[in-house]
């Protein structure tokens, strides 16, 4: 089980450790873990560590200090290390001194981009105390980095993303790897942080009610068929998707149901021949009414919004079965919300931002 902690919980857990350790020791401990992760990422992406080029984009907080110390440790492994200081007057002084003493080079202020030939960028702009989008100088740097395809390793969180909600209100760094310290934060579950690696820095963390499943938890809960099971005890999924214009949607949606280890998949709609040619184990019918016994429906992908499509949506939602509503079915449902207003059975809507807006439920957040 993954445990997630607020920024305040992390800071409270850090306080006794900071008091017990020499000044700067906890930062160097975190930076050592960061440097190890960056070295592994260099091997994975650039084929090695020594001789590779790393550039830290450094903000004014402790995250910038972490990035500078990590770059310092990487210098000792033969990495050419550069730093772009976004706020030179507020850069972590001891970390910057160590970086320069190790042969690291400062390439200018925030109006200067990362050097040509950089193999990896360390995002040390803002950490768990930061809020809001990237400021213009940092935004320009990370926009250029994104266009160049240079990989980014974020320190704690990708800068510009809200640590509590994962919301992105403007320019933000896009990281292929995020290295975080002490404990996971909500942002690591709510936003795209790339791969997330947790570095143990010796914090004693409290109990938390912010929990998430990992692969082991899912595997432990995943039902496995026994000797007395059949297709009905394992679940029969009915798929209402596709049309003459979009038969591929039916193929993809039905294939997803097959891959999800449903006990049986039934398809109902005009793309029956195409579906069965790709998935011969699927039982196909021309309409939902003729589909046979179903225990849950998915309706909408490529369905269209004509009368036949509306009939399929109505059929699914008028049942007492669980229904997933997606794509064209969401468009129709936004026009006819009464179809779900009195539903007691489980109903899952999966809108993207544009589909969400059609429901007129308020501003679109990153998690809709």
Name what the model sees in each region.
Residues 69-147, 274-293:
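N-terminal small/polar loop signature for handling phosphorylated ligands or for N-terminal nucleophile
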